[in-house]
Amino acid sequence: MCIRDRLMMQYIHKHFGEKISLEDIAEQAVVSKSTALNLFRRYLHDTPVHYLLKYRLQESASLLVTTQKKVMVIAQNVGFENVDYFCKMFKKYYKMTPTEYREKHITKGLD
């Protein structure tokens, strides 16, 4: 992994709760959008936008288990403007709704 990839990833990790564009990510490594895409694909086998989506979903999963915040609030905290889209993407990634995920993992912790 090169320094430019690390710079882009650090930016995503720091600002994932905000509205981030491919241009914002590319600017962090002082590269064009197409170069940012190529670097991500080469070293991370992913696109910056998809990496951001996965990171947001992973952070939301952590918040579901470690806080009692409502799903809508968590969705907003991790950068989703639309809770329905958040729930759809969460279910696609984790194969269950955010509420089901919370119930499963909180119950698991009580066993």
Where do the protein language model's features map onto the residues?
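Low-complexity basic/metal-binding stretches
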Residues: 5-6, 25
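Terminal helix-turn-helix DNA-binding modules in bacterial transcription factors
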Residues: 10, 14, 19-23, 42-84, ...
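Conserved small/polar residues in nucleotide/adenosyl-binding loops
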Residues: 1-3
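C-terminal interaction modules of eukaryotic adaptor/scaffold proteins
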Residues: 91, 102
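Short hydrophobic/aromatic patch on the recognition helix
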Residues: 36, 40, 85-86, 90
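Helix-turn-helix
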Residues: 26-33, 37
